[in-house]
Every structure is written in C-alpha cells, then in structure tokens.
C-alpha cells in the first residue's frame, strides 16, 4: 500500500494515489455498450445521424454510436474525461501471490516427480502495453482462429452486450481502446511446470553387465496452463500486445 505520495491534491477521492496498492491500475469504468435506445436516430442507411439523448453521458471521443463502450460518469458532469478514471481497480499488474508446489514419490525403483507453479491476485488490461492494440490469436484452442475471434464483436445484427469486442472501426478509436474495465482480465494462472517419470535399475542387476548405475526417464516441461486470459502465455504478461513468444513445451527422454 502507498502510505505517502507527493501528489497535487485531487478534486475527487477516486483520483488519490495515497492508500492504493503498488502497481495498481488506473482505469475508466466501463458501463456496457451504447445501445440504439441511447440515441435519437434520423435518416436511413449510410445517411443515418446519431445524437445522444438528453441525460445519456457522452463518450470519451466524439462520434460515439451504438456498440461503442459506455463509461461511468463518476463526477456526474455529463462527460467522460480524465476525472472519471479510478485508481486501484482490479488487482495489481505484478502478482501479489507467487507460489509453487510439487510431489515426489518412489517405489521399487520407479519414481515420479511433478511440480506446479502459479500466481494470484493480479490483473492485466488487454492492450495496455501497446497503445490499445493486442493480438488475441496466439494461444490455446483458439490459436490463429482469427475469424472466430473477430466474429465475437458487436454488430447491428448481433447487438449483444456479451461480446469481447465493441463496434469495429477502420482506425484506432480512443473511446474503445482506452484502458478500462472492459479490457480488464484476471491474470492468475496455474502451470504444470514439469513432470518426470522414470526408473532406477537395481545395482544388483546392473553388476551383471558391468554398469554401476542406470536410469531411464521421460521429462516434460511447460505441459499445460490454466488461466482466464486464454489468448497468450499468461506468465509472459501483456507485453508487446500478445506477440511475445510463449514458453516452449519440451520433452526429454
């Protein structure tokens, strides 16, 4: 926890750094996506014009439309700006808990060793390290499944709030790429770091063939991982927008 911080007195308490955790996130608070009911819509087709209804908070950028991210107006002034960011949202970017545990067992020369490692109490914001850009197709069962991932977005035909991506834009649109709780993810993980199974031949048996010791084994490293991000190796964090090369799965015999 930050006990003292040399900061200009803030207008609102949620902007205060003092009392927050180290490496915490300062984010806009997403309040779902804009819907057609938030606008007065005139015209047809490509000539449609959108005007926010009275009482509906404006976006972080001009020209918001249905499907863009809507943010909570924390200070109630009817607009979204830096005063609506909140300190210490989610968990810190650096894990507060790092752990490992394992098991070793042996019986009549046969043995097995297994080791897990993981982290907890940590969050990441997708795209935070790369100006809002990230590549969600590097990892897991959806690896390289660009088509299925891009389909998980808001469209007029699928005006769902339960999508990964808001309305698509042909260029970077600050309203939708700003660091916010829309992109906040639990970054905890548990990894099966390594497992080894083998057999130590008995000395009595080996003496018959002139060998002092012999062991055969199969070892695997970085075999699997359980996490909530599922787009890139969680142990590497959110650096480089997901383009960092994952830890290799290896086998040794």
Regions found by a protein language model. Give the residues of each.
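Outer-membrane beta-barrel "beta-signal"
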Residues: 247-253
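Membrane-embedded beta-strand positions of outer-membrane beta-barrel proteins
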Residues: 114, 216-218
